[in-house]
């Protein structure tokens, strides 16, 4: 499949111009909001891959520049907001975040978007807690073609080994970003799932037939790759997974390397 330069505007001659619009999706009885970006289409009846983007916690970084770059490269892109945050209905929780990834992928695969998406080419991108949700969704039966994890957050590492850092949950809960069923829901979920959500323990449940690309920042003090990713990575490598691990000299959100990041994400989806 042909991809295009993510750093150049679409070349003339399309049969359908790039466009964008909002999405409303039902997730377990609540409406969640999303948005799609449609690439320029150059052939009648053409279907293109789709990248589904999962944001972190609480989600100030939406990686919209990456979404636009992937759209310019020829992909449909869908980004969305989990239940209980950024206007989506319902209550926020870690388990709801995982369920909502399933919801969006199922929505796309069902054809309900009405877009000419190649549903055999669904790619998943997860940043930080979006990486947590992506991995846990994959471990509970989610089917996609390729996965890119940017600085994924193994929050159960903190639950098991750095409980003092979980005090930040109280601060974020008090920020007003989340609508919660009860004030202690996040701590309660971590106590219940500290073993089954812990990244190394996911490996035996992850699909082995798809390629994984994981990128961590050498200056990341939020979710350092050495502690959050490498124990899982070693187990994946020992069990024959198709996994590529990269490190780059940047922080948790890669603010200093956005153009390089866009090219790297596209290359992973294009070549693997």
Q: Where on the chain are the PLM-derived regions?
A:
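Histidine-bearing beta->alpha loop at or near hydrolase active sites
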Residues: 84, 245-255
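Conserved alpha/beta-hydrolase
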Residues: 70-89
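Active-site glycine-rich loops that stabilize anionic/oxyanionic intermediates
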Residues: 48, 55-59
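Primarily recognizes the serine-hydrolase "nucleophile elbow" in alpha/beta-hydrolase
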Residues: 107-168
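Catalytic nucleophile-loop/oxyanion-hole region of alpha/beta-hydrolase
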Residues: 58, 63, 83-119
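N-terminal cap/lid segment of alpha/beta-hydrolase-fold proteins
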Residues: 1-45
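The alpha/beta-hydrolase serine catalytic core
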Residues: 10-12, 144-233, 238-239, 255-263, ...
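The conserved beta1-alpha1 loop
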Residues: 54-56, 216-217
């Amino acid at each position: 499949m042909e991809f295009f330069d993510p750093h150049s505007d679409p070349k003339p001659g399309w049969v359908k111009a790039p466009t964008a619009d909002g999405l409303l999706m039902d997730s377990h009885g609540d409406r969640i909001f999303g948005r799609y970006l449609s690439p320029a289409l150059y052939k009648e009846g053409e279907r293109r891959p789709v990248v589904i983007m999962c944001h972190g916690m609480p989600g100030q970084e939406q990686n919209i520049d990456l979404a636009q770059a992937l759209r310019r490269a020829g992909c449909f892109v869908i980004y969305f907001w989990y239940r209980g945050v950024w206007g989506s209905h319902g209550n926020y929780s870690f388990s709801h975040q995982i369920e909502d990834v399933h919801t969006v992928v199922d929505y796309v695969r069902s054809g309900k978007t009405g877009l000419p998406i190649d549903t055999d080419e669904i790619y998943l991108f997860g940043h930080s807690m979006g990486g947590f949700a992506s991995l846990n969704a994959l471990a509970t039966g989610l089917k996609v073609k390729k996965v890119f994890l940017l600085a994924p957050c193994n929050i159960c590492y903190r639950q098991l080994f750095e409980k003092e850092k979980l005090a930040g949950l109280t601060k974020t809960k008090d920020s007003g970003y989340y609508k919660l069923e009860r004030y202690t829901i996040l701590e309660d979920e971590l106590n219940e799932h500290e073993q089954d959500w812990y990244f190394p323990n996911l490996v035996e449940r992850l699909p082995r037939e798809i390629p994984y690309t994981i990128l961590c920042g050498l200056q990341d003090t939020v979710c350092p790759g050495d502690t959050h990713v490498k124990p899982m990575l070693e187990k994946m490598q020992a069990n024959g997974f198709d996994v590529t691990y990269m490190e780059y000299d940047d922080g948790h959100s890669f603010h200093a390397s956005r153009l390089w990041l866009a090219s790297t994400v596209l290359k992973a989806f294009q070549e693997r």
